[in-house]
Amino acid sequence: MEVTDIGNKEEGKVWHRKPTPGKSVLASLVRTAQQGKVVRFLHVTFDTTGDCFLAGDHHGNIYLFDISRNRFRLVLKTGQACTALAFNLRRTTEFLVALADYSIRCFDKDTKQLVSWMRGHEGAVSSISVHSSGRYAITTSSDTAQLWDLDTFQRKRKLNIRQSVGIQKVFFLPLSNTILSCFSDDSIFAWECDTLFCKYQLPLPDSGPRISYKAFAVTLDGKSLASGGRSNLLHLWCLESRQLVRVIQMPSQVRTIRQLEFLPDSFDGGASQTLGVLSQDGMMRFINIHTCKLLFHIGSHDEAITAVAVNPSGRHIVAVMDNGRINIYSVQNLTQELNKPPPAQVAVVSGSEGVPDLPNLKMKVRSEVLPRPKRISGRRPQVKLLSLPAASSAEDKENELPAGLNKKRLVALLKAFGEYPAKYRMFVWRSLLCLPENHAAYSSLTDKGLHSAFLTLHEKYPIKSQKLQRALQRVLSALAHWAAIFGEVEYLPLVAFPFVKLFQNNAMLCFEVVATVIENWCQHWFEYFPNPPLNILSMVENVVAHHDKELLQHLVDCGITSQLYVWPLLETLFSEVLTRDEWLRLFDNIFSNHPSFLLMACAAYIICCREPLLHCSQRQDFEYFFHHRNNLDVGAMIKEAYRFMSSTPADLHPRTMLSDFTPLTSGQYPVFNKYPEFIVEYQSRERERIRLQEMEYLRERQQMSALRADFVRRRAEEEAFYAQQELLQKAEEQRKHVLEQEEEKLTQQRAKLAAMKRELKVKELQLLDATRRRFLKHQQELQASQIKKLDQEISRKMDLRDKETATAVQDLEIRQMELEVQRKRLEQRLLKEQQHVGHKVEEEVRIKMKEAEENLKEMLHGAETNMQALEESLAEVCRLDLESDWQREVVERLQKADAERERSRGGVEELQRQTGTEEQGLVNAMREEAHRKKDEAAAQIQESLQPRPSTHSDGQRLMGIHSAYAPPGFAHRHACSAGLKGESLTDRNKSASFKQAETNMVCLNSSSPPESTSTAFSFCRGRTQLDSGERELLKEIRELRQKLAARAKEGSSASSQTVCTPTPVSP
C-alpha cells in the first residue's frame, strides 16, 4: 500500500506508482504539517461521475482528488473546520460546505470563488442532502432542518421541532420528490417536497428493543430504507408498502451502528443488495441484505474507520481513518474473491467425446464468506488443456472465427474455467458474434438523429451518467431507424442497457451486438407484439414442466403464469437478478452456444430457485423475486442449463423451433421484418398523431405561457403602481402627521401664550385688588375716625348709655371680625371678576351712598349713640359681605361649563323671581315695621337727633342697607351655593333690587315722611320705647336670618342632583 503525503502541496499525484492489481487499498493519503504533525481529514464526498471526490481537513483546507487522472489539487482554504460536504448535482463545478460557524457556503472548484453564503442555523450542520434535480438542498442540524433553493440561495422552508425531540437526519429520496425526516424518538416521516404535505409515517415496531436510529441509507431506486443505531440490529423498510420487511442482526462485536451505505451495482437497476455497516469498532462490514451473509469488510481495530463515502458507480470506496488518513479502496478487488470461479477440476476426457460431461462434475459451494486463501506458492494452479481428437476439415472450417480463433477451443476453455478472461472478453464476444463492423451503414443510421420515441428516455429511465444516457439514446435510436418496431418496444432499453454500459466507448460495436442478440436470441419475440412472445414463454414452460413438475404445479396453483416468472428474465436478459460478473459469466456461455441456450438458462434459473419459490404464495412475492437479486450460484445454474440442453426431448427442445446463429451481413444490415407490420404502423401513426397533438399542446402551452408572462408582467406593473400609490399615500400621511404635529406645537404655544396672558391679567387683578384694599382700608380708617369722634361726642352727652354702648360695640366688633375673616376667605375666589363687577358695583354703591348721605344729612340731625354704632357696624359688615359674596359667586360661575349655564337658565330665572319676591316681601315687612316704630317714637327721637345730622345720616344709611338687603342676600347666597349658572344675571337683579331697596329705604327712627329731607329729633323723648323696639327688631332680623340660612342649606343639598329652586320666605 502506497502512502502519499500531501503536505503543503497545492497539487500533485495521488499515487506515484500504479497500484498493484488485486490489492484492495489503491492508495493511502495523509497530510503532515510542520514538525511532523498529522492534519486530520474529517469529511469526504464524491461527485456525480464518481471519478472525483472532495476531502476537508480540520484546518479548513478542501482538496479535490481525481482518481481517474491520478491528480489532486487544493481547492480553497476556509480557515475553519468543515462539518459537511456535498456536490451541487446541477452545476457540477459547484459544491456546498458547512463550516464550524454554522454557515453554509457554495464554492466553485474550478474558479475557487465564493458563489454564495447561507446562514440560518444555530448549531453545527451535520448533513447536506441535494435533490436529484440539483435545485434544492436540505441542511440538517440537531435542532432544525432548512430547505434551500440553490438557484437563488434563499431559504424556502424551515423545520422546527420540540426541544424534547431532536433531528437525526433529513434527506431527499433518490429519483423522487419526497423528503424523509428521521427524529431521535425513532419516528420517520415522508414529506412532499413542493407542498411539504406529510405523505406517510413509517410505523414503529411494536416489539423488540428500541434501537435509537442514528444511521440511514436508501437504495438508488428509492424503494428500500436501512436504519440502525445503538444496537446490532438493522431494520430494512420497504418504502412502497411502508412496512418493516426484515430485521438483520449483526455479529455480537457490533454494539452501535455509525454509518450505513448501499453499494451500487451496474446491473441491479438501483435495487442495491449489498449494504455496508460501519460500527463502533471502526470496521465496515458489507452484507447481502437478502441472504444476510457477510461478504467482506474493510478497516480493522488498528486502522479504524470514522466515515465512508461510496462511489456512485460502485467502483471505489473512500474511508476517513481514525488516524486522519484517507484510504481509497477498489470494490472490484474487494469482491474478486467472491466472483472468481471455483477451483479448477481435473476432468478425464475420453477420445470419443468432444467435450467433457460437465453436468456430471458436481461441486459443493458454500454460501458463507470464504476467507482469502493463503498463498502457498507464487504460481497459479496450472490447468492442462487436453488435446481433442482431430475432426474433419469441414468442421474445422465451420468453427473458424473471423479473428482467427476456433470456436471449439473457446468452448472448451469456457467449460474448463466457467468464463472467458476479463481482459479478452470483449474480443472473444466480437469473434463469437462475427460482428461485421459496418461503419457506413451505422453512420447512415446515426445521421438520422435521435428517434422521436427516445427523446424523453431520461424521464422514464433516469441515469446519473449523462454520457451513458446519451450513448443509450443513440443506440436505441439507431435500432429504431433500422426497424420501425424497435421504436415501439417498451422493454428495449432494458435489453440494450447492459451492452451499452459494456461498450459505451464504441457505439457501433454496441449497436451490432444488440442487433445480433435481437436477430438470434430474440427470435419470434415480436410475432405477438405488443404482447409478450407467448410461444417462447410456452417453450420455457414446457422445459420446466418436463424437469420439475412439482414446481410448475405450484406456480399454476398460485395463479402464476409464464409472463410473470419467465418474461421478466428475458426482457431484462437477467440484468436485474444477477450481478455484473455473474451476468458476464452467463453471457459468455449464451454467446458460445445455440440461441436456445438462453431459454434453457431461464428454465435453469427457475428450477435452481425452486426452494424459495415453493415458499412463495402471493403474487407480490413472485414479482419481487423475479425483479431482484437472489441467493443463487450462477455456476450451478449454468450447469443445469447445459444439462437441460442435453437431456430435454427433441419435441420439447427449443432448438427445433429456433434457427441457428446467423451473424449480421457485411456492408448493409439485414432487413428485420419479423413482426406484425400493421400494428407497428398503427402505433406509428398513433405516435405521430400524439406527437402532433403534443406539439399543438406545447404551442398552446407556449402561448399560454406568453399570456401568463404578460399577465404576470401586467400584474407586476399593477402591483408596482399600487405599491407606489401606497408609498405616496404613506408619504402624504407622514406629511399630514408632520403638519398635525406642527399644528399641535402651535396650539401648545398658543396655550402657553394664553396662560401667560392669564397670568398677566391675574397679576393685574392682584394689583387692582391690592389698590382697592388700600383704598378700603383708608376709607375704613376715615370712617373709624368719624365713628370715634361720634362716640366721644355721644359719650359726653349720654353718660347713662356708656355701659350698653360698650357692650354693643364689643358684640359688633366680634361680629365684624368674624365677617372680616369670612370676607377675606371669600375674596380670594373672586379675583377674575373684580375688574368687571367690583368696580361697577363699588361705583354704584358709592354713588348711592353719597346720595343717601346727602339726603339723610339734610333730613336727620343725629341719632342715639348705641343705635348709630350698631347701624354703622351692621351696614359695613353687610356691604363687605355683599362684595365678598359677589366676588365668590362670580368666580364659581366662571368655572362652570357653558352647557350647564344654558340648561339651568330656566331654574335660575325661577330662582330669581322667587328671590325677588322674598326680598320684596322682606322689604315691605321691614318698611311697615319701620313706619310703625317711626310713628311711635317720632316725637322722642326728633329732639335727640338734631345736633348730629351727618352722624344720623350714616347710621340711617347703614341701618337701611342692613335691614333692606342683607337678609335676602344671605338667603340667596346660601340657596345657590351649588354653583348654578347664570348667577351673574341674578347678581345684576340683586344689584337692581339693592338699588331699589336703597331708594325706598326709610329710616327707622325718622318721624318725618320719606320725602322730607330734614327733620329735627330729640334724644330725650321715648328712649325706653326706642330701646325696646330696637331690640325686638334685631331679634326678628336674627330669627329671619336663621330661617333663611336653614332653608338655603336644604336647597343646597337638593341642588347637587337637580337645579336649585328655593321656595319664597314668608315675611
From Swiss-Prot:
GO cellular component: centriolar satellite; centrosome; ciliary basal body; cytoplasm
Disulfide topology: none
UniProt-annotated location(s): Cytoplasm, Cytoskeleton, Microtubule organizing center, Centrosome; Cytoplasm, Cytoskeleton, Microtubule organizing center, Centrosome, Centriolar satellite; Cytoplasm, Cytoskeleton, Cilium basal body
Highest rank taxon of the organism: Eukaryota
Cited SMART domains: WD40 (SM00320)
One BP annotation, GO: cilium assembly
Polar residues biased stretches: 941-953, 1052-1067
Keyword Transit peptide: no
Keywords, sorted A to Z: Cell projection, Cilium biogenesis/degradation, Coiled coil, Cytoplasm, Cytoskeleton, Repeat, WD repeat
UniProt region (Disordered), positions on chain: 896-955, 1045-1067
Rab-GAP TBC domain sequence ranges: 419-594
Any one GO MF annotation of this record: molecular adaptor activity
Basic and acidic residues bias locations: 896-912, 926-937
Kinase in keyword set: no
InterPro entries named in the record: Rab-GAP-TBC_dom, Rab-GAP_TBC_sf, TBC1_cilium_biogenesis, WD40/YVTN_repeat-like_dom_sf, WD40_repeat_dom_sf, WD40_rpt
Repeat (WD) residue spans along the chain: 36-75, 76-119, 120-161, 162-201, 202-249, 250-288
Coiled-coil portions: 724-773
One Pfam family cited in the UniProt record for this chain: WD40
Disruption outcome: Morpholino knockdown of the protein causes a delay in embryonic development and evident embryonic morphological abnormalities, resulting in a significant body shape alteration associated to microcephaly, microphthalmia, pigmentation defects and pericardial edema. A significant reduction in cilia length is observed.
Main function: Molecular adapter which is involved in cilium biogenesis. Part of a functional complex including OFD1 a centriolar protein involved in cilium assembly. Could regulate the cAMP-dependent phosphorylation of OFD1, and its subsequent ubiquitination by PJA2 which ultimately leads to its proteasomal degradation.
Name assigned to this protein: TBC1 domain family member 31
Lineage per the UniProt record: Eukaryota, Metazoa, Chordata, Craniata, Vertebrata
